[in-house]
Each structure stands twice: as structure tokens, then as C-alpha cells.
Swiss-Prot record:
<dbReference type="InterPro" id="IPR036962">
    <property type="entry name" value="Glyco_hydro_3_N_sf"/>
</dbReference>
<dbReference type="InterPro" id="IPR013783">
    <property type="entry name" value="Ig-like_fold"/>
</dbReference>
<dbReference type="InterPro" id="IPR036881">
    <property type="entry name" value="Glyco_hydro_3_C_sf"/>
</dbReference>
<dbReference type="GO" id="GO:0005576">
    <property type="term" value="C:extracellular region"/>
</dbReference>
<feature type="glycosylation site" description="N-linked (GlcNAc...) asparagine">
    <location>
        <position position="105"/>
    </location>
</feature>
<dbReference type="Pfam" id="PF00933">
    <property type="entry name" value="Glyco_hydro_3"/>
</dbReference>
<comment type="function">
    <text>Xylan 1,4-beta-xylosidase involved in the hydrolysis of xylan, a major structural heterogeneous polysaccharide found in plant biomass representing the second most abundant polysaccharide in the biosphere, after cellulose.</text>
</comment>
<protein>
    <recommendedName>
        <fullName>Probable exo-1,4-beta-xylosidase bxlB</fullName>
        <ecNumber>3.2.1.37</ecNumber>
    </recommendedName>
</protein>
<feature type="active site">
    <location>
        <position position="291"/>
    </location>
</feature>
<dbReference type="Pfam" id="PF01915">
    <property type="entry name" value="Glyco_hydro_3_C"/>
</dbReference>
<keyword id="KW-0624">Polysaccharide degradation</keyword>
<feature type="glycosylation site" description="N-linked (GlcNAc...) asparagine">
    <location>
        <position position="421"/>
    </location>
</feature>
<dbReference type="InterPro" id="IPR001764">
    <property type="entry name" value="Glyco_hydro_3_N"/>
</dbReference>
<keyword id="KW-0732">Signal</keyword>
<dbReference type="InterPro" id="IPR026891">
    <property type="entry name" value="Fn3-like"/>
</dbReference>
<keyword id="KW-0378">Hydrolase</keyword>
<dbReference type="Pfam" id="PF14310">
    <property type="entry name" value="Fn3-like"/>
</dbReference>
């Protein structure tokens, strides 16, 4: 989300510049003036009653004018304009509802690593800490008149295809990992699980099955994602189920694409039957926004309905409450006159929106709201700086090391490549200006190194004009660092990749550097992976790190790893596929399981990876032992009966305990990844393995051990039937820890008859008469 369809981009530009023009208070005056006479200002009433009072006082024109992301308010009532569109993917981000000052207060915010790198840390507590800081800074910007209270983050679509331009915005490819990430992120952003008074509103996007931008001429605006109930339930929806049902996020964004023939923002089954009814997401102040231009796409790109009036009605009737675009304000009056929706449907949408603002304290006296006291002094604090650094260090993954790292001494280092002196490139997308960005060169100097710098080549250049200078710099150095990979000229919103090789002639330059027989370290940046086969095979490349988009702390964090100040412990949150993979399956094929024209997707269904999901090396060695070799036995009846009022799939199946021992010489964190395999259990085909739990053990000293407890939910042991039902099957199961290690395994059995834990609502079928679906 952010790039609009062409019809709406001038509108977005106007909104952006008008938002920069004012830093007045965003809050209404409930003490004097006309709004004080409305019960929306009566703090003794519940949020819904207060919102109903406000909506009841609006004229039809005022109602319609407030269904748009930059709502005009109602001056007659004393209701100010409000911008619902604010961004904070990895820190408060510039544009639309958010404005940064040119200097001084509110001219910067903390910039954390992009979610793909934060996801590589596999640290749920860290995710919550990062989200807590982001929400505090977001609230400070709102209180200072520089932003709204609603933030359209996080992106929790799983990173299914390595070519996806927006994979960098997600924590990875695994649905359990995404689900735990979003639970803790929403907890930190909203300040609790379903709080009566959220600090800010988070928005889980893009609902659903959205992971294509523009591939081979197929654009997201018109793409129809054809997904089976099994893949939908098992892979594309779990993170959204956790976000809404369990974490109780206050907002959801429907996506550009169609799902099985129906645009998601016009899909009543998706937004009403599944989201609100089946997942129980009907609490006060929960609302749905369309992605920016998505309601326009219903008729202009998907051709699902005949015109704008039918598109507006289709979206409103399906359960979309807010339009990030102009279709609602332009066509809702005409649609009402045609009888395409009723007035109460419009009222309900506005009540959901304004009851959310009531919960946020938008209409309350500042003295009654603890979050209203958050100010500029809580932005970019020393603790936030340290957390950004820590988050970056925790996520960096070591992919190769022949003993070159950690660096043994100072001396002269040649830093070469397009990321050698990069600044904003390190941030990825949806970024705001930080106070500083630490480059690799800055970090080298501050670690006592003499630096020889030469860029050598660009990200996607085929010119070798800079090679000679780079080779000369390398010859004068004791150690060579090549910093390259991909950036947002290669992968971004609106742009997928067509290949997953290193772009341009970067590998040619690395090859020539490797011939110098100097210690050579390659630091790979970018959200998506590239095929590292040649680097892994090249004996002249001593070490290889993946650093994602590390943001403000980037160079400093990388040098902490290079010098051994910190030990690498991150794990790949995605599969690194061979370059040939893109020739085997089109991006448009949404199927996960292997077939005649699909080699399979993600580590669960594909086993020919260059580097597998969960891979990551250390400066030390570890041993893992089970505290029990066998667990159970378990019975489907007792397991499926549940012990609390929580959904049974979230209940604890068991806690599996292991002992992790540092058998090397360097203190280090260790991420315990727990995978489940089963012997012909459930429907065919059978997954290679499934992540069912993880935990990051911190600071294990040489020779020391830590007990690690891995909680596994009932839903993690279950499998998904072809109709989408979540089913617990009897059978024999095996547990293994880590990737590519020969650690002992544990086993357990489940007896009894198969038990359905969750009946997946039957998806509606695409109707051929879609144009008339929303008629009288």
C-alpha cells in the first residue's frame, strides 16, 4: 500500500502537501463551541453511544464526506478534518497524515530495521519492545499535530515468492512465525491486547492473499489470486486470524487483488462471514479500510461491477468502512439514490470509525488521557537508539565463515560496493528521517580502522569502469569488505523481480576481489534473497553476512558482528532459492504444494534450497539435548476438549524442554527452532516439516547451558484438510531442533479419532452476474 492507481495519485500528492502545511492540534474542542453540545463529548457514555450521537447529527453530505481517508470533518458541528492514513512500518514514516519539521522538534524519529531483518531475530519480546517505542513516538507526533492516531501497519502477508517486491515489509515466509510476530507487534503498538484505551490503532494488511506487485505485465490492481480453501486456511490467513481474533487489532486493510474472482474489498464472505463472524472481530471500534485505490479497482480494473456507484455499494455492503481513494465520496450519494445500499449500512461504517476515535481519547479532555502527555522528549531517546541497534544486531545472519570472522585486528580495510557508503538505501521503504544513519565507512573509522573506499559498481550496472579503482583500493588494504546486494531500485512496492540473481556485474567484481587472496567478506543487503551459490562455493570469499535493510544503526551493527563485539545468531526467515526457481513456477501460481508445474513453495514443500529457512551460523558451536526423549501419549479427545475459553487451536498442546550447551569459545545467543514431522498423518501430500515453536536463548557463555522451553499450540500440531478445516489427526510425530544439525530428536504419538478443531466457512463462489449482485 501507498502507490495509488493513476486516477488517485494527484489526490494523494495534494493530501501530502496539505498535511505538511499545518501542525495544529488534530484534536477537536469538546469544551466550547458546537461539538460540546453533542454526546460524543460525554465521557460518561460508552464509545458506541458517543459515536452514534455524532453520526446522528450529520447530514448525508457530511456522512459521505467522512468516508474518505482524509475526512473533511463537519465544520457545522465543530468536527475537525482528520487523516486516517499514517504509516509506521519500522518507525514513524513520512507522508500523508504524517509530517516532519524541517529542523528541530519532530524533524526525525527512530528508524528500526525493516521487518524482514527484525523477523530474522526470532525474538518475540524484541518485536514488542520495538512496537512499543514506535507507538510512543507515533503518539508524540499526533499530540504535536504532526500525525493522526491510526497507523496502517503491519504488513503480514507471508513472503510466498522470492520475487515479491514487498517481501521486505514482512517478517518472513512461515505462518506461525508471522502469527507470533504480529501478535507481539500489535500488543506493543496498541499497548495491550484489546485495550479499552489503545495508544494508537494498528492496521493489519493486506487482507488477503496479496503478494504480487507488477510481474510480467500483470499488475496487483487487476490480479485475481486463485487460492484453494486448503492453502487459504493453512497459509494465507493464519497471521490475519491471529491479528484480529487473538491480538484484537482495531483495523484491517483489504487488498487490491481479487480472491477467487471477487475483489477483496467487495468480498462479503471475507470481510463479514470470515473476519467479523467466524473470527469474532466485532468488538467496538473495529473497522476496515480499503487499500489506496482498491475500491476504484473493483470496477476500473477487476470489472467486477459496472461503475463507481456499484463499486462503492459493493464495498460498503461487504463491510469496507473507509475508502483510501475517492469512490466513496464521489459515488455513495448516487448509489443510495439507486437503492444499492441502505442508510443504516453507511451509519454503521461511520459508527465503527468514530467509536475507534472515541476509544483513542480523541474527543476527551487532555488531562483525562495519559497518552496525551507524550511529547517530543520521548522521541529518539537513548533507550530507543540502543533498541534500534540491538534489533539490527540480533537480525543479522551469517551465511558463511571460514574463520575470517571475527576480524582479528585493526589495520586498513577496503570497503567496496554500492552499499559501502549507503545512507537512506539502508532504510528500505516506508521510512521516516532518523537523526542519523551509520554507514559502514563511519563504523569502520569509529572502530579504529583506516579505510580505503571505492564504490566499484552500482547495484544494477554492467559498466566495469570502476573496477580498477576498487581493485587498487583492495590491494592497499589488509581486509576487503564488499557491500552490495539489492535495494529499492530492484525490489519495492509496485515492482517485483523477474530474476533472483545478484543484479548487474556485482558478482564479477566480487570474483576479481576474491582473486587477490586477501581476507574478503561480503555483506549482502536487501529484503529478498539472491542466489548465493557462487559465493558459497568461492574459496576466496571468506565470509558472507546478510544484513537486510538495517536502517539507522546499519553500519555500526554490521561492524559489531564483523569485529566480534556481538556474535551473530540471526536465522534466515525465508528460503534462499536457486536462480533457476523462477523458471519453474510463475508468480501468479498461488499453490503451495508441489505439482506437475510447481516445484513447491517455502521450506514446507520445497527441498532444493541454496540455503534453507532457519539457516544461520555462529562464532561458536552448540549442542542440544532433550530433557525427555518421548512425550505423551496424547489423545485427540482430551487435546481437542480445551481447558480455557480461548480458541482450542491456541491452547497449549505441550511444553517441550531442551538443554542448549555452548560447546565453543564465544558467548552467543542461540535460536531454537522446533520443527514437527509426521509419518503419513493427514491429507497427502505431506509437508517436509513444519515450524511449531521457537525461542531465542540469550548470552550463553562458553561451557554453560540454558534450559529452553518451547510451547507448542494444539493448532500447530493439527493439519489443514482440503476444505480448509483445521484437523487434529492421530499418528506418530517427531520433533527436531535447528536446521542442518544432527541433534537428537524426540517423538510422541496421538491416539483416537481425527478431530476438527475449526470448521472453515465455505467460501462463496464467484458469480457470473457480478455486475447486478449489489442491485436492488
Amino acid at each position: 500500500m501507498v502507490h495509488l492507481s493513476p486516477l488517485l495519485r494527484p489526490l494523494a500528492a495534494f493530501s501530502f502537501f496539505t498535511s505538511l502545511a499545518s501542525t495544529e492540534s488534530i484534536f477537536p474542542d469538546c469544551s466550547t463551541g458546537p461539538l460540546s453540545k453533542n454526546n460524543v463529548c460525554d465521557t460518561s457514555l460508552d464509545p458506541v453511544s458517543r459515536a452514534k450521537s455524532l453520526v446522528a447529527a450529520m447530514t448525508l453530505e457530511e456522512k459521505i464526506n467522512n468516508t474518505k481517508y482524509d475526512s473533511s470533518g463537519a465544520p457545522r458541528l465543530g468536527l475537525p478534518a482528520y487523516n486516517w492514513w499514517n504509516e509506521a512500518l519500522h518507525g514513524v514514516a513520512e507522508g500523508h497524515g504524517v509530517s516532519f519539521s524541517d529542523s528541530g522538534n519532530f524533524s526525525y524519529a527512530t528508524s528500526f530495521p525493516m521487518p524482514i531483518l527484525l523477523g530474522a531475530a526470532f525474538d518475540d519480546d524484541l518485536v514488542k519492545q520495538v512496537a512499543t517505542v514506535i507507538s510512543t513516538e507515533a503518539r508524540a507526533f499526533a499530540n504535536g499535530g504532526h500525525a493522526g492516531l491510526d497507523y496502517w501497519t503491519p504488513n503480514i502477508n507471508p513472503f510466498r515468492d522470492p520475487r515479491w517486491g514487498r517481501g521486505q515489509e514482512t517478517p518472513g515466509e512461515d505462518p506461525l512465525h508471522l502469527s507470533r510476530y504480529v501478535y507481539h507487534l500489535v500488543d506493543g503498538l496498541q499497548d495491550g491486547i484489546g485495550p479499552e484505551r489503545p495508544k494508537v490503532v494498528a492496521t493489519c494488511k493486506h487482507f488477503a492473499a496479496y503478494d504480487l506487485e507488477n510481474w510480467e505485465g500483470i499488475e496487483r490492481y487487476a490480479f485475481d489470486a486463485v487460492v484453494s480453501p486448503q492453502d487459504l486456511s493453512e497459509y494465507y490467513l493464519p497471521s490475519f486470524k491471529t491479528c484480529t481474533r487473538d491480538a484484537k487489532v482495531d483495523a484491517v486493510m483489504c487488498s487490491y487483488n481479487s480472491l477467487n474472482g471477487i475483489p477483496t474489498c467487495a468480498d462479503r464472505w471475507l470481510l463479514q462471514t470470515l473476519l467479523r463472524e467466524h473470527w469474532g472481530w466485532e468488538q467496538t471500534g473495529h473497522w476496515v479500510t480499503g487499500d489506496c485505490g482498491a475500491i476504484d479497482n473493483i470496477y476500473a480494473d477487476h470489472h467486477y461491477v459496472a461503475d463507481g456507484a456499484h463499486a462503492a455499494a459493493a464495498a460498503l455492503n461487504a463491510g469496507t468502512d473507509l475508502d483510501c481513494g475517492s469512490v466513496f465520496p464521489e459515488y455513495l450519494r448516487s448509489a443510495l439514490q439507486q437503492g444499492l445500499y441502505n442508510n443504516q449500512t453507511l451509519n454503521n461504517a461511520l459508527i465503527r470509525l468514530y467509536s475507534s476515535l472515541v476509544k483513542l481519547g480523541y474527543f476527551d479532555p487532555a488531562d483525562d488521557q495519559p497518552y496525551r502527555s507524550i511529547g517530543w522528549n520521548e522521541v529518539f531517546t537513548p533507550a530507543a537508539e540502543e533498541l534500534a541497534h540491538k534489533a539490527t544486531v540480533e537480525g543479522i545472519v551469517m551465511l558463511k565463515n571460514d574463520g575470517t570472522l571475527p576480524l582479528k585486528s585493526n589495520g586498513t580495510v577496503a570497503i567496496i560496493g554500492p552499499f559501502a557508503n549507503a545512507t537512506t538505501q539502508l532504510q528500505g521503504n516506508y521510512e521516516g528521517p532518523p537523526k542519523y544513519i551509520r554507514t559502514l565507512i563511519w563504523a569502520a573509522v569509529h572502530n579504529g580502522y583506516k579505510v580505503k573506499f571505492s564504490q566499484g559498481t552500482d547495484i544494477n550496472s554492467n559498466s566495469s569502469a570502476g573496477f580498477a579503482e576498487a581493485i587498487s583500493a583492495a590491494k592497499e588494504a589488509d581486509t576487503v569488505i564488499y557491500a552490495g546486494g539489492i535495494d529499492n531500485t530492484i525490489e519495492k512496492e509496485s515492482q517485483d523481480r523477474t530474476t533472483i540473481v545478484w543484479p548487474g556485474n556485482q558478482l564479477d567484481l566480487i570474483e576479481q576481489l576474491s582473486d587477490l587472496e586477501k581476507p574478503l567478506i561480503v555483506v549482502q543487503f536487501g529484503g529478498g534473497q539472491v542466489d548465493d551459490s557462487s559465493l558459497l562455493a568461492n574459496a576466496g570469499v571468506g565470509a558472507l553476512l546478510w544484513a537486510g535493510y538495517p536502517s539507522q544503526a546499519g553500519g555500526a551493527a554490521v561492524f559489531d558482528i564483523l569485529t566480534g563485539k556481538s556474535a551473530p545468531a540471526g536465522r534466515l526467515p525465508v528460503t534462499q532459492y536457486p536462480a533457476s526457481y523462477v523458471d519453474e513456477v510463475p508468480m501468479t501460481d498461488m499453490t503451495l504444494r508441489p505439482g506437475s508445474n510447481n516445484p513447491g513453495r517455502t521450506y514446507r514443500w520445497y527441498d532444493k534450497a541454496v540455503l534453507p529457512f532457519g539457516f544461520g551460523l555462529h562464532y561458536t558451536t552448540f549442542n542440544v539435548s532433550w530433557n525427555h526423549a518421548e512425550y505423551g501419549p496424547y489423545n485427540t479427545d482430551s487435546v481437542a476438549s480445551g481447558t480455557t475459553n480461548a480458541p482450542v487451536d491456541t491452547e497449549l498442546f505441550d511444553t517441550f524442554s531442551i538443554t542448549v550447551t555452548n560447546t565453543g569459545n564465544v558467548a552467543s545467543d542461540y535460536i531454537a527452532l522446533l520443527f514437527l514431522t509426521a509419518d503419513r498423518v493427514g491429507p497427502e501430500p505431506y509437508p517436509i516439516k513444519t515450524l511449531v515453536g521457537y525461542s531465542r536463548a540469550k548470552g550463553i557463555e562458553p561451557g554453560q547451558s540454558q534450559q529452553v522451553k518451547l510451547d507448542v499450540s494444539v493448532g500447530s500440531v493439527a493439519r489443514t484438510a482440503e476444505n480448509g478445516d483445521l484437523v487434529l489427526y492421530p499418528g506418530s510425530y517427531k520433533l527436531e531442533v535447528d536446521v542442518g544439525q544432527d541433534f537428537p530428536t524426540a517423538t510422541f504419538t496421538v491416539s483416537g479419532k481425527e478431530k476438527v478443531l475449526d470448521e472453515f466457512p465455505e467460501p462463496q463462489q464467484n458469480a457470473t452476474s457480478a455486475v447486478t449482485r449489489w442491485g436492488r
